[in-house]
Amino acid sequence: MNSSKTSPQRMTLSIVCSLAAGFCAASCYVTFRRGFNGEAIMTFDVFAFWYETPLYLGYASTVFWRGLSVVIFTSLAVLSSQLIISLRNQKHHGTARWAEIGEMQHAGYLQRYSRIKGPIFGKTCGPLWFGSYLTNGEQPHSLVVAPTRAGKGVGIVIPTLLTFKGSVIALDVKGELFELTSRARKASGDAVFKFSPLDSERKTHCYNPVLDIATLPPERQFTETRRLAANLITAKGKGAEGFIDGARDLFVAGILTCIERGTPTIGAVYDLFAQPGEKYKLFAQLAEESLNKEAQRIFDNMAGNDTKILTSYTSVLGDGGLNLWADPLIKAATSRSDFSVYDLRRKKTCIYLCVSPNDLEVLAPLMRLLFQQLVSILQRSLPGKDECHEVLFLLDEFKHLGKLEAIETAITTIAGYKGRFMFIIQSLSALTGTYDDAGKQNFLSNTGVQVFMATADDETPTYISKAIGEYTFKARSTSYSQASMFDHNIQISDQGAALLRPEQVRLLDDQSEIVLIKGRPPLKLRKVQYYSDRTLKRLFERQMGSLPEPAPLMLSDYSNDQVQSHLAEIANFNEDAAPRNRTVAEDHGSVKVGADIPERVMGINGDEDQADAREIPPELGCASRIDAGSGRSTAIVGPDYCTSAKIEVRTGTACEMKLNWVQFVSGGMLRFDKVYARSQLSLYEVSV
């Protein structure tokens, strides 16, 4: 604590000192005005200027006016220096302050609605007034910390979904985001998808995370599968940590084997390992059958282990996440892909990951897998010229997903690939329980916009108070002498205090929020309420029509053997086409999806092979078979999907079709744009 005289006395002393310095400087001028020599030095008098004043001479000489100028300039220079030093000393306890609206508007964080491109976090005024909205400016990632019923949904999540200009992947824990915003997203031109594997009415789009790996070159498949395994299979308890690597190896080998067999789904991996019998015999058999060297090596190693060890590996594999695919709903929802991650930057897409609070912990492995793959695919290549849309990951109830190593790493790099994260948690302790200190600090240091609403825990208010910092203020104290009450001493000292104390954070009213922005002073803003905001309310109420719900997912009553038998009949339907197909495969194996079909390759409609599409078993709506030996690959689309489904058929690459029943050339990537009625089943062959 520094004590000093009262402020007026200090100012008076500073003025006196500056005038004295100016008077001395003027005396130096008077003494040395004719030259700097030894005689002048010997005759120097500090009162030399006094002898040139009108008070001494009786008139104002030219030397006096010049000396007076020296006094004025010197005094001002000395006084300014004293003030600068004094102001610096006053800030040594801190310079924290609240940001001003003007400076935040100039920096691009506060924008009018018409200029909003990023998320919406708050507003400068109440809902009935035209104010500026807080967006993230140049900061790609954000963190929202708000307890239950604090208004993060109506104030941040829903306004962001109504206004964000790019693609969005939204974790919709309650399902209300899809109901409240999907029509607005669709009206703005988004392709809207709802991924809800455990929906009570089975209304869900599908996503197969293995399909992307199956379309990669063989030399890339092992690495991507290991990445998939690391995010899906997690150790449940300390006892499982010693077996987690082996469990992940088993998963990798299972994926590679299923890709090789033409059943690239995690459900097929579950069925593969769920076969009855001794596991070492199963692994030995798989090692003999597999043509993939990595899968062979893993199965060989496993087959040589003791039965108890193998049981531990398979148990950790199942408990770590694979047992989720015992549910037929999960199997069906991950049997095909209705949307492509590669389209997220190319065209506006909104994917709602709808999970009820009761199912969130259960589906956490699948959600982790999905986010890992989304992040991985986005970072495989820099955005091209036609990939102009940013991708926002809107992660509500982020804590319940468990530890996401892929996102923990990607938060430092994905901004360069047009990726953004918005993490929503109830308190900072949610990060503490899931990530270690280094991981927690990684999230806090890389989220450039942090929004806090009133919270009752201990950690969050303390963090906010420390992050805002302290300011310096003048503390005045008065002491009295015991001898006389009129004899007293007043002291003023510089002290520091928190701009916002932890208890003040807890007392934050329901309409306010605190925002920390990297490199900027803190902000205290009004919360947004979309249902009462004069701009957002109109946008919300303009939504019309029905929800863009997907068709109910069909669960098959047919056995796998029946499906394979039916597929075998189809594969042998046109034996004579095989030689021609091989020829075309050699000539046109590199034709890209969507390219014009070469003139000498044509689709032939076999009228004699037409049949009623209703006779196709529901299984065939999502089944595919690759028969490389006969030179053919066959895809079947059931009656519910014949006019709109995307069929991924792989004999080395993916092909998108819109047909009832198509026969492709082996290895080819040809696209037929004809669409046939639901009542007709058409067989196509390619010939030269």
From Swiss-Prot:
GO CC annotations, alphabetized: plasma membrane
Disulfide bridge map: none
Keyword annotations: Cell membrane, Conjugation, Crown gall tumor, Membrane, Plasmid, Transmembrane, Transmembrane helix
InterPro entries linked: P-loop_NTPase (IPR027417), T4SS-coupling_protein (IPR051539), TraG/VirD4 (IPR003688)
Top-level taxon of the source organism: Bacteria
Pfam families, A to Z: T4SS-DNA_transf
Main location: membrane
Compartment annotation: Cell membrane
Membrane-spanning segments: 12-32, 67-87, 153-173
Bilayer topology annotation: Multi-pass membrane protein
Family to which the UniProt record says this protein belongs: Belongs to the VirD4/TraG family.
Protein name as annotated: Protein VirD4
